[in-house]
Amino acid sequence: MKDVPAFLQQSQSSGPGQAAVWHRLEELYTKKLWHQLTLQVLDFVQDPCFAQGDGLIKLYENFISEFEHRVNPLSLVEIILHVVRQMTDPNVALTFLEKTREKVKSSDEAVILCKTAIGALKLNIGDLQATKETIEDVEEMLNNLPGVTSVHSRFYDLSSKYYQTIGNHASYYKDALRFLGCVDIKDLPVSEQQERAFTLGLAGLLGEGVFNFGELLMHPVLESLRNTDRQWLIDTLYAFNSGDVDRFQTLKSAWGQQPDLAANEAQLLRKIQLLCLMEMTFTRPANHRQLTFEEIAKSAKITVNKVELLVMKALSVGLVRGSIDEVDKRVHMTWVQPRVLDLQQIKGMKDRLELWCTDVKSMELLVEHQAQDILT
C-alpha cells in the first residue's frame, strides 16, 4: 500500500506554483469523489507543465494506481496515454499498455484505444507486421461500435500513417479522409493541416482506383494550401476531378517538380483520361449519352484508334457502363459511377434539372392546349 497522502504532500511542497492543483487532487481523493478526481487528473496530465521528465510516471505509480480500478476504463486509457509518452524505452511502454489493456477489457472503446496506442508504438519502432495485425484486429472491433466515437480518429490516424509508411496511396487516402471526418479541423495546427492536405492530395492522384476527389475538394483542410507555394496541387486536383486533360498538361510545369508525380506521369495521364470519359458521360443528359469516338479522342487528347481501349478500361474497372458500337464508332453510356461532386458539378446538375423542368412544363402546356384534339 503506497502512502498517497505523503506523496501528495511532498508534491505540494516541491512545486509551490502548482500547490493548489495538488491540494485539489488530495481533497478529491480523500473524499473519494472518483468521477471528479478522474476529470481533475485528465486535466492534470494534459498540462504542459507536467509533460517534462518522468513526473507523470511517478504520479501513476504513487497515486493513480491506487484508485485506477474506480476510474472509467476509457478515461483511464486516456490518462495512461500521457503517462507512456514519458517512457523512453518503447518496450517498457508496450508492456505497460498490454497490462492496461487487461485492466480495461470491460470496455470495447478502452480496449480499442489501448490497442491503437500499442499499434502506434509498433509503427514507431518499425515493426510493420505487428502494426498491420493490430490494425486488422482493431478495425474489426471498431466496425461493431455504434456510430462514430472518440476512438475512431485515433485509429484512422494510426492506419493512415501505416499505409503512408508502406506506400499504399489508395488506402492512405481513404483512411486519412476518415480521420479528418472524425476531428474538428480547427483543433489541428495550420502546419499540420497543410501537411495533411498535401499528402492527401498526392495520395489521391497516385492512388490506384482513386477516382473520387470531391470529398477532399470540399474539405476545408485543402484551403490551407491556397495562396501558398503548393496552390498548384489544388489546381491539379480540380483538373482531375473535372477530367480536364488540357489543364493537367498546362500545370505540368508545377506538378512536374514533385518527384513522385513526375515519376508517374504516364499513370496520371491514364487516370485523368478515364476521369475525362466519366465527366463526359456525367454531363450529358441521360437520354443523350451517345459519345462518338472523335468526341472522346478530342477531349481525352488521344488518337481515335485508342478510344476503344480507353472505354474498355473504364468499363472493366466499373467507372461506367455501356456498349461500344465499333461500326458507327460510337459509345452508348447507360451509367457512370457516383462521385462526391464539387460546386461546379453541382451547378451543372442544377442547370440540367432546370432544363428538364422547362421541358416538362412545355409538355404540360402542349397537352393542355391540345387536350380537346387528343380526347376527340
From Swiss-Prot:
Top-level taxonomic group: Eukaryota
Modification N6-acetyllysine occurs at: 298
Single Gene Ontology MF annotation: structural molecule activity
Keyword match Acetylation: yes
UniProt KW Amino-acid biosynthesis keyword: no
Family: Belongs to the proteasome subunit S11 family.
Function: Component of the 26S proteasome, a multiprotein complex involved in the ATP-dependent degradation of ubiquitinated proteins. This complex plays a key role in the maintenance of protein homeostasis by removing misfolded or damaged proteins, which could impair cellular functions, and by removing proteins whose functions are no longer required. Therefore, the proteasome participates in numerous cellular processes, including cell cycle progression, apoptosis, or DNA damage repair.
Name this polypeptide is given: 26S proteasome non-ATPase regulatory subunit 13
Organism annotation: Rattus norvegicus
